[in-house]
Amino acid sequence: MTLWINGDWITGQGERRRKTNPVSAEILWQGNDANAAQVAEACQAARAAFPCWARQPFAARQAIVEKFAALLEAHKADLTEVIARETGKPRWEAATEVTAMINKIAISIKAYHARTGAQKSELVDGAATLRHRPHGVLAVFGPYNFPGHLPNGHIVPALLAGNTLIFKPSELTPWTGETVIKLWERAGLPAGVLNLVQGGRETGQALSSLDDLDGLLFTGSASTGYQLHRQLSGQPEKILALEMGGNNPLIIEDVANIDAAVHLTLQSAFITAGQRCTCARRLLVKQGAQGDAFLARLVDIAGRLQPGRWDDDPQPFIGGLISAQAAQHVMEAWRQREALGGRTLLAPRKVKEGTSLLTPGIIELTGVADVPDEEVFGPLLNVWRYAHFDEAIRLANNTRFGLSCGLVSTDRAQFEQLLLEARAGIVNWNKPLTGAASTAPFGGVGASGNHRPSAWYAADYCAWPMASLESPELTLPATLSPGLDFSRREAV
C-alpha cells in the first residue's frame, strides 16, 4: 500500500512500478501508480478537509508542522539513508538535505508572519487591515534531485497558510516521498489535509487536469513546466508556481588564487553530479595566460574526481546520477557538442556500464555555432573564452533561462555592472552558483520559471491577500459628497 489518501494507506490501481538503486541496481521500492480515479479521490479528500484545516488557528497548524520537524530530527539517519540509496548521492550530501528540510521549517514559520501575516493601520474613522487567505486545494509536483528538501519547500508553507494538498513525488524517488509522508502522518495531520499519489506521466496529467484544483506548485524540468503552463492556460483562477532550472553561466576573470577559483567552479558545476538546477552549465573564462592556467588546473582537479557509491568509505565528492539513462543522456549531449565542433578538455566516462556513475566532462565551445540552449542535468561543463567583460555579460545573458549567474573576480565594479545587467534571479560574487540562502528568494526569470519557490518568498504564492476597511460603528459622514441631500423634509 503506497498511496495515502484521506488518512488511509491504499494500493494503487495503475501501472506497476519499482525503484532500484541507480548504482547497485538493488530493488528499493515497489508499488502501483495511482490511476485517474484515485487521483480524483485524493482531490475530493483534500477539498473536504480544507474548510476545517483553514479555520484552525495558525498556532494549531504550526504545532503539527513543528512536530514534523522534530520527527525529521529523530529519524534523520534513516531518512538520510533512504535519500542516498534512492538518488545515488553520497551519504554526506543526503544528510545535508535532511538538515535543510529541518531548518526550512523554522524559516517558513518566520516567513509566514513576515510576508503573509495580518497588518493593521489605524484610520481616523476606523482601520485598514491586510489579511491572507489560503487558496484551497493545491497539487505539489516533486523533483528527484532533492526529493525531500524541495517538495518540503512547497508543502510546509502551503500547510502553514491553511491549504490542503495532493503530493506527487517524482516517479524516480517514490521511496523518499513515501517515507516523508509517513512522518507527516505521525505528526498528526488530519485526514485529507495531505495526500500522496505515486506515479509517472499519466498520474501527473490526471492530477494537473483536475478541475477542482486551486493551484499547482512544481519543481522540475523546463519541458514539463511549459507543458503544465499550457495545460493551465486560460485558467487565471489557479495559482501556478514553476521552478524549471537553468543554463547557468559562471564568469571567471583573472584571479591570483587559481586553486580557490577551481574549487568554486567544482562546487558550482559538479556537486550532486551536476544535478542541481543552479549548477554552472556554461563557464566563461577570460582569454590570456591566467585563463589558460585556470583551465589547465580545473581539468587536472576535475579529472581526479571519482564518483562512488552512497556508502563508500572514504566518501566521494559525487555519487551516481539518478539513473543509468540520465548518465547516458549526458554522454549523448557531450558527443553532440563534439560533433558540432567542440574541443573536449576532459572526456566524461562511465565508471561501469549499466550504472549511473559518470565522471565529469569539460568541453570548449568558443566559436561553435548552434549549441543547444538547454539544461543538461549532469556533470558536463561547457567552456567559452571571452576578450572583455562586456562580452562575458553578453554571453552570460545569451540564454532563454535566467536562474543563476556568478562572477569570480576581485573587482567590485565588475560585480556592480553584473548586478545591473545580468538576467538572473540569483547573482553571486566569489561564491558557488549552487549556494543559496533559504532566507532569500530562490528562483529565476524566463524559462527558469516564475514566483520564488522553496524559500523565504514561498509564503507569497501559498496565500492571497485580503484587504479590509473596518469600523465597529456605522456613522453618517459630517461632510457629504456633492449632490447628496440627507436633510429632513417637512410633510405637507
From Swiss-Prot:
Keywords: Arginine metabolism, NAD, Oxidoreductase. The keyword Oxidoreductase applies. Disulfide bonds: none annotated. PANTHER family: ALDEHYDE DEHYDROGENASE-RELATED. Pathway: Amino-acid degradation; L-arginine degradation via AST pathway; L-glutamate and succinate from L-arginine: step 4/5. The gene is astD. GO terms for molecular function: succinylglutamate-semialdehyde dehydrogenase activity. Catalyzes the NAD-dependent reduction of succinylglutamate semialdehyde into succinylglutamate. This is N-succinylglutamate 5-semialdehyde dehydrogenase. InterPro entries: Ald_DH/histidinol_DH (IPR016161), Ald_DH_C (IPR016163), Ald_DH_CS_CYS (IPR016160), Ald_DH_CS_GLU (IPR029510), Ald_DH_N (IPR016162), Aldehyde_DH_dom (IPR015590), SuccinylGlu_semiald_DH_AstD (IPR017649). Its EC number is 1.2.1.71. It catalyses: N-succinyl-L-glutamate 5-semialdehyde + NAD(+) + H2O = N-succinyl-L-glutamate + NADH + 2 H(+). It comes from Salmonella paratyphi B (strain ATCC BAA-1250 / SPB7). NAD(+) binds at residues 220-225. Belongs to the aldehyde dehydrogenase family. AstD subfamily. One of its GO terms (biological process) is arginine catabolic process to succinate. It is an enzyme of class 1 (oxidoreductase). Pfam families: Aldedh. The active site is at 243, 277.
